[in-house]
């Protein structure tokens, strides 16, 4: 009887416990994972495997230039360059020494016997005619050139001969024409000739001054010495090559000593005929 009364009570207690468990289970289902984790401690799991290597990244910006490095070793000598342009022609060299006499040549063959002819006098006449014709041609050429222009003072005419000659040939050519190389013995004459040279578009010409006979003792073409007047360029005469015994006039009017073998134009002077 005692156990029979207790059965209903036991059943009632079990029912209450089951109901309580049901309520707890519903609360757990309705609660979020965060709430669950916040009320429960989760232990860390084991270490995972290494992941695969990622792709190469994009090339970054260039950095600043580093400090200047040390000087490198001397390189190998390069190949020779191409031949350059030909330079300007240098000044005329000094006159060379006279060469040795050559060896005698072989004797010529025997000539044919000639016929008799009394041609000597005719040859002399023909030879003189050739000389006269040559002088006439030279004079004709001179007259044609003179028409192109001369300069004059009260007593003299001056004419630039546009033929390249050395000093001695220039003297001869002026004498053949009846004059001599120009001798500027005063400032007025010197200025007239200098202006003449410039107006003709020239740079220099021979004039009648030299020290051929005695070094540093310059004389005119008529052998009269230089006296009170001269117009030397600064530093002249200097006999630079050791053979500068003749004189040229520049378009500036200055004088310069040069080698007599130089071939340039020259200026002649002629006395005016008095009436």
UniProtKB/Swiss-Prot annotation:
Signal peptide as annotated in the record: 1-25
Pfam families: Collagen, Lectin_C
Domain (Collagen-like): residue spans on this chain: 51-110
Residues bearing attached sugar chains per UniProt: 30
Subcellular location, record wording: Secreted
Disulphides: 174-268, 246-260
Protein name: Collectin-10
Organism of derivation: Xenopus tropicalis
Lineage: Eukaryota, Metazoa, Chordata, Craniata, Vertebrata
Name of the coding gene: colec10
